[in-house]
Regions:
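Periplasmic/cell-envelope proteins involved in peptidoglycan metabolism and beta-lactam response
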Residues: 1-252, 268, 342-354, 363, ...
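Beta-lactam-recognizing serine transpeptidase/beta-lactamase-like catalytic domain environment
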Residues: 53-55, 176-187, 228-273, 278-513, ...
């Protein structure tokens, strides 16, 4: 009887398990014998405009441990400490945890990975992960940026276009044997979706030329910082953009925030005399002056609006053309007085100052220009020559392009297109006209004057051998914290385009706090000259710089 009752209970228990608890117990068993593994998608490649890879993925070994399987942990810790340089305390902590899987080191150098594999230590294993590689290290670092350990973009277009580049992870359920060892068989799998590729507007060779010359000026003049932009004036395409200081995209763990800052789009400064192109363009467009109108430049000293203006060298009578060629502050202010505050402000804004231009890089700032109702009595004597206004290098590049292209403000852009892994086009960026600024006639007349700046005026060191060029020098005193202008801190600049008659590119060079020399015509103009010379020859197919060819 007792046996019968026991048998009945067993049958009842089996019936309960079979029909009421089977799904629960099956899930428990699967958890013990299956492992869900995320499958990493391929992160998209970043190319220059000629489809030369600037960032791509490489398969690397990542080292993991199953702590319970490792014997002689002290010896293993010593070996890994020697090979990987990891702290003993870190290894001791990881290897003494009660886990079935724990990372020790990810995306290893192939030599280190091979050395550990030769040791054949039970309880250590490797999984393939992808590491982001930047083949040109420092080149275009402030454009490209970088991604982190988990291939998530952290800076530059790597961050701004992460949703395009990252792809969609897949997953697989791998079977395990009775000892919990993963078998190379899966029960279910969802294939990852690869990320999309980015094609930039920059040209690797022009970028190299620009960085080479900027780096030389930055070091030769012991500068605090420097920026350069090379742009197609007709479209707004950025052909090169660089800053100093910079950093290595493959080794950014110890980089300062100052080195990572994209100064060309986020640093605000008073432009000084390069800003005179706005005053000059507005005066010609409004028919307030002609090229041959004469201005008395007060022999270098002029008391006006409660302040005293000085020219860097005394001038008497100068034509309007000569006022710009010789960069006369006094002459420029007299021209601005003819134009008036409201019209001057109109042209400052029309040239793109005081608002964001909309470049497809994060961090752009709008700059600073107050409306006339907030001007002081000295503003009409300051703004025309680039004081009381804050600008970026990008805004100057777009502004000088207005003169180069016949009067149009173009939206600058850095992304040419987005493509899938097969190269099929997903998105194509095209030139965008923001608005018309001045007439073609005014642009042509200013172009001739700016050609004279290089031929006869302050920009002689910007003269490009074999090609005509036009441009404007700038030497701006920096503001001290107390609001006064410094006598030993300057921003040297040059903005220009070449060839003058049919411009291929515009170039802006900004050097912050150079010394001992600080004049734009001495510090920045030679950078323009060398970049324009080499870049135009490269574009025309006449000559490739030897250094670029070697690369």
């Amino acid at each position: 009887m007792v046996f019968f009752i026991f048998l009945l209970l067993c049958v009842g228990r089996l019936f309960f398990i079979q029909f009421f608890r089977s799904s629960y117990l099956t899930s428990i068993a699967k958890k013990q014998h299956n492992q869900l593994v995320e499958l990493e998608p391929r992160r998209g490649t970043i190319y220059d405009c000629n489809l030369k890879a600037q960032a791509f993925n490489m398969s690397m070994d990542s080292l993991y441990a199953v702590p319970g399987e490792i014997k002689g942990k002290e010896n293993v810790i010593n070996q890994l400490n020697s090979i990987l340089g990891l702290k003993r305390s870190y290894l001791e902590d990881r290897l003494n945890r009660k886990k079935s899987f724990i990372w020790l080191a990810r995306k290893l150098n192939p030599d280190k990975s091979a050395t550990i594999k030769k040791l054949n230590i039970k309880g250590l294993g490797f999984l393939k992960e992808t590491k982001r590689i930047y083949p040109n290290s420092y080149l275009a670092s402030h454009i490209i940026g970088f991604s982190g350990m988990d291939n998530i973009g952290l800076e530059g277009v790597e961050r701004d276009y992460n949703r395009h580049l990252k792809g969609i992870p897949g997953w697989a359920i791998f079977l395990r044997d009775a000892r919990q060892k993963k078998l190379d068989i899966w029960e279910k799998m969802v294939v990852p979706v690869d990320g999309e590729d980015l094609v930039l507007t920059i040209d690797e060779v022009i970028q190299y030329i620009a960085e080479r010359e900027l780096d030389k000026a930055f070091k030769d003049f012991h500068a605090k910082g420097a920026s350069i932009i090379v742009m197609d004036p007709h479209t707004g395409r950025i052909l090169a953009l660089a800053n100093r200081p910079t950093y290595d995209l493959n080794d950014h763990s110890e980089v300062s925030k100052d080195s990572m800052r994209n100064r060309a789009i986020c640093d605000l400064f008073e432009p000084g005399s390069v800003f005179k192109i706005v005053t000059a363009s507005g005066a010609l467009e409004e028919k307030k002056v002609t090229e041959e109108d004469v201005f008395f430049c007060e022999n270098g000293t002029y008391k006006v609006g409660g302040r005293i203006l000085h020219d860097h060298m005394p001038h008497g009578l100068l034509t309007f053309r000569q006022v710009i060629e010789e960069s006369s502050n006094i002459g420029t202010v007299k021209v601005a007085q003819l134009l008036g505050p409201d019209k001057l402000y109109h042209y400052v804004r029309a040239f793109g100052f005081g608002s964001k231009l909309g470049i497809d890089l994060s961090g752009e700032i709008s700059g600073m220009i107050s409306p006339p109702k907030l001007w002081s009595k000295t503003s009409i004597t300051s703004i025309p020559m680039g004081q009381e206004v804050g600008v970026t290098a990008l805004q100057l590049a777009s502004a000088i392009s207005v003169i180069a292209n016949g009067g149009q403000l173009m939206k600058p852009y850095i992304i040419d297109s987005v493509r899938d892994i097969q190269g099929r086009l997903i998105k194509q960026n095209k030139p965008v006209l923001i608005h018309k600024v001045i007439s073609i006639d005014t642009a042509m007349r200013i172009k001739k004057i700016l050609t004279g700046v290089i031929e006869e005026g302050t920009g002689k060191l910007a003269k490009v051998s074999g090609f005509s060029a036009a441009g404007k020098t700038g030497t701006a005193q920096k503001l001290e914290p107390n609001g006064t202008y410094s006598h030993n801190k300057f921003v040297a600049s040059f903005i220009g385009f070449s060839p003058a008659e049919d411009p291929i590119l515009t170039i802006v060079v900004i050097v912050d706090e150079p010394h001992p020399s600080y004049f734009g015509g001495v510090v920045a103009a030679p950078v323009f000259q060398k970049v324009a010379s080499d870049a135009i020859r490269y574009i025309k197919g006449n000559e490739l710089p030897l250094e670029a060819l070697a690369r």
